[in-house]
């Protein structure tokens, strides 16, 4: 079985949610125009927020997988093209809303989040704003286990 994967090399701007989201949307649309048989697009760590920031900046940028605007916007493109999308984002815990994670979400072909990986070994600067995850989740898809 052959799987067509596109890996996005983008440089997000710290704190500029709209710019970062537009860059991601443009990349998805361009990829699907040029390579319509793409099945999975993978974006980098913290693609929606930018990387080096303060606790306050990440608190303002964080979202949950249930109600995040970026989840919905990227999910709508996953559903439109029938593809899987992975991207990194600062995740807010749904129960303990002051707890943040450096996470990656897998969006399915219907545009819904399948699950989240929370970075297990954050670097020293990341530890100022995010908590370490403790699992290595695997997700069953029609492409195989991801």
What are these regions (language model features)?
Residues 11, 47, 90-91:
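Catalytic metal-binding/acid-base residues of hydrolase active sites
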Residues 1-38:
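N-terminal active-site segment of His-dependent metallophosphoesterases
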Residues 1, 79-86, 98-100, 132:
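Short, basic and Ser/Thr-rich N-terminal targeting/leader segments
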Residues 20, 31-59, 78, 85-86:
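Active-site beta-strand/loop signature of hydrolases that rely on acidic residues for catalysis
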Residues 2-16, 42, 103, 116-118, ...:
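Active-site-proximal beta-strand elements of phosphoester/diester hydrolases
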Residues 67-92:
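A short, hydrophobic beta-strand-centered structural micro-motif
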Residues 66, 76, 93-146:
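Active-site catalytic loop in hydrolytic enzyme cores
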